[in-house]
Amino acid sequence: MKNFKNIVLAFSLLVTVVSKGQILPVRLTTEMAENPLAVVENKPKLSWQLVSKESNASQVAYLILVASSEEKLKMDDGDIWNSGRVNTDKNLHIVYSGKPLKNETKYFWKVKVWNQAGKVSKWSRNASFRIAPLESDLNPTWIGAITKADSHLPEGRTYHTATFNREKKNSFINASDSLSRRSIMLRKPFEVEKAVKEAVVYISGLGHYELTINGKKVGNSQFAPLWTDYDKTVNYNVYELSARDFQKGDNVIGVLLGNGMYNTLAERYTKFFVSFGPPTLFFKMKIKYNDGSEEIVKSDGTWKYSKSPITYNSIFGGEDYNANFEQKGWGSKGFKDRDWKKVVIQEAPKGVLRPQTAPPVTIQKQYEVKTVKELKPNFYVFDMGQNLSGFPTIKVKGERGQSIRVWVAEGLNEEGTIAQGRSGKPYYYDYTLKGDGVEEWTPKFSFYGYQYVQIENINYKDAKNKDLLTLVDLKSNFIYNSAGEAGSFACSNEIFNKTHELINNSIKSNFQSVFTDCPQREKLGWLEEIQLNGPGLMFNYNLQNFLPATMQNISDSQRENGLIPSIVPEYIIFGGDFTDSPEWGVTGVILPWMYYEYYGDASLLEKYFPIMKKYVDYLETKSTNHIVSHGLGDWYDYGTHAAGYSKNSPIALSATSHYYYGAYLTAKAAKLLGKTEDYEKYETLASEIKTAFNREFFNPETKQYGTNSQFSNSVPVFMNIVEPQYKEAVMQNLLADIKEKGDRLTTGDVGNRYLFQTLARNGENETMYRMHNHYDAPGYGFQIKFGLTTLTEQWDPRKGNSWNHFMLGQIEEWFFQSLAGIMSDPEKPGFKHFFIQPEVVGDMTFAKADYESVYGKIASSWEKKDGKFILKVQIPVNTKATIKLPVSKDSEIKIDGKKAGVGYSEKDKKPTLELGSGIYTIECKL
């Protein structure tokens, strides 16, 4: 119960500032972000959480002040908006309704609330938001070393490894100018002669950039800006600077550029070739002085550039660095740049400039060497202890001109050397020494999925061979998106605990600019993983600002005919079912609804409803009598066959069920949004698809769907396609197949969620327990027994390519919703009301989870002890929960030691409690 004690302690610390009987607004957000620097909406939504020492606390009214300065806000002068007292319990997504907001302007706000007893709170702490500029305000000029026309880079998105040979690849490389893919440094001196109040930087460096002011890095991002389809959207980043970032007199802006996904043409391994142009920079800085004057420094023809010491950089192939090409102090004043060249004005990317509102990728963890083996003299293989996405940091000592090559990989060959055959080769990092003591280097523009590092022709630690350089130190940097974690889970079952860890290490490894399939071979945003793992992702990570960016990418990638491609951004067109598979494309329909359910925010439904309709309409054009027959089906379903296309279940059954689900959710969205005509259209369409599906795939005599596979029977139950009178019979067929298979699954990437949740939602959690509580394949336990630290692409790692895939991680939903019992209420989105209904299965003695909802922390922690079932729960202020207890109807139930008034759910056959906010201990006799 240690985790729950920590939760209680954190909650207690938060409310110590609140006196008895009071309530306090905390964690103020604008457009779901704390103090955002680039709000696009001119009527942004304001939200806050609430804390209180007392139970059953709620809000009955609020008052918001928005001011043009912190000074005015301190004086309670809401010169931009004074909402007055508004009587409502709503504390999320309050639409700003004050004076028109100005672009490139910062505003400050605070709120106070009244509780259920009519007592008013103290003012919250101040929060702020800055309105983004229009693209016309930015008036961007793009600069670099070479124009796109002079680069001779290939156009198009069909060049990939399956269709490419080395000669064709080399012909493209030879035809292009080497400067078009070279990392460059750009610098711009400027003067500051007055006292600076603040400065705001708007920057986009494509593919990726590193920004310095006077030699000091600005921000902590890696691989900024985040990936987009640069023909449709180009992200820019915003930074606030203060007077301490400048010095009186001469100052210098420095920018380092790399290729990223913007320009993947390169030697060595690459999954595909795509080039939107050579590296390019847009920069604008607005400096405000204390005297009220302003100054603009922006990218133009006065900037200079030079080749950087990064002599090779490829998002797929690695990175090389020659320290002898360093130019010390190039980003600071006093540097002589007479040998630098003037930049050229470049053709602007085609995409619309948009502020990056999703969180950046950063270095989140660092790992030391776990073990090292010297396979032969001066030939070392290092185990870093964790498979991850990232890059190494090396410290070396040697003579000028000596070089070190760092190979990385997920696994090892039989002889103990690194194995890149499955994950894309060759991939490595080269560093050439300048011979100046101990030198430290960290790559900047390339990452890979790896656990093992191989380095040849070196001394390690001690300089035994004077002719070789010495590796002094080695570390692994784990990079992933900085969105932050939203939940935690643990239980008495060690297989489940380690499974949770495996899955989350894989999620983190693939949580980059987009959710990728793997961090080495492809690094592509295959869509199905997001929606099929959606609830598990939501419970574990804060995706409030990430998913809107995902939907923008989906919108950008949607074709004119309505097709949503399987990969987003669609850097490469693989064609056929790998471009057009309904289970992947329907993500554009499912995600806005899932976002609404978890965050209580309908903005994605409102904004992307046309996208949803257009995709369902597209599937209608692909159907015959409402049956859709194309796609990948239940990809990688399990059996004796080779993994790939669905073999156990009809592809048409899979495609048509997702066509139905898309129409069904589009109808629900239309109803919510008050679009009556659309609701009637898609409600009718969903009904017709359902009828056609049952006519085509259901056998009324055997009560089986399709091939009677686990996928075939679970999908219609999950989606409520099966007619009610047949549901139990279909369930029995499903259970019979599971039993026949020895309580093992046969579903794949698509089917796992439907199988798991069909069992969980229909009282078969014991079956789920047996299905996963073992060390055999198919099963998570087999990968644990195999000694892996991340989830793999196939249940048997020896058969798959990637050892860092989260596509099979759908059990996370079961951990949180069933074992811990935290379940949302679709009728009260955002967990305004929710259920806590833990399932006690197998020989488990405890389970616990917490989830940071938009209203605050939700926690559930149960244990079986001394003949009692003890459940501890935390319910956020301004919410309510229904507790469903896994005990008999006549069990004695106490809350905090006192006998409780208990209801009973005939449907679930469980005693129930209705509770308001607070922390409670519930005891039941077993």
For the regions a language model picked out, list residue spans one by one:
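C-terminal capping/lid segments that line or modulate ligand- or cofactor-binding pockets
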Residues: 253, 321-322, 522, 540, ...
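Alpha-helical support elements that line or immediately flank enzyme active sites
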Residues: 199-203, 213, 391-410, 453-458, ...
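Bacterial Sec-dependent N-terminal signal peptides
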Residues: 1-25
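Extracellular/oxidizing-compartment recognition motifs
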Residues: 23-106, 110-521, 528-529, 545-546, ...
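Alpha-helix capping and helix-loop boundary segments enriched in small/acidic/polar residues
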Residues: 174-181, 218, 226-230, 241-243, ...
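Active-site acid/base region of carbohydrate-active enzymes
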Residues: 208, 300-307, 460-502, 508, ...
